[in-house]
Amino acid sequence: MALEKSELGALLVMDTNNIRYLTSTKIGEWERDKICRWALLTKGSAEPILWDFGSAAVHHRLYAPWLKPENCKAGLLGLRGTVNPAFGLMERHAGEIAALLRDAGVAKMPVGIDIIEPPMLFELQKAGLTVADGQQTMLEAREIKSIDEIALLNRAAAMVDGAYHLVHEQLKPGVRENDIV
């Protein structure tokens, strides 16, 4: 809904929280700060496209029936600078993204991005795409919660409250944190 109301033609997200929101996938805490996965959602489509490590892409095809198998793609970008842009991964994926946007009829519209590595931003621009702020559109989308989301948030909050209560009961002078955990 937020994308449909915006001037954006698509959202390209690389923030793990936004990827989870658009695709209902998460591969673990280790990928949190790597900018190694990304998802694309075009205006007028309810089908996100997800790029992930090859083995994770295969896993999504097998165990994420809510995603179209052909929309679970293997991909790798710069891993926050550890893969040199000269290797060509960013250029290749920017071209792939531009082609998908052309196919969806939104390539001439701005692409909203939440976070990105600068070399990938430059490659998207070289591919002829106009890049815009997509963070606010994603935040607007995430404001609206279903009854199930609210129930899960309440359950998670209750679990945290319970954990803090147990810590509070055990915490006394002379007790070390690692003894409680």
For every predicted segment, state its role:
Residues 114-118, 174-181:
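An alpha-helix initiation/capping motif
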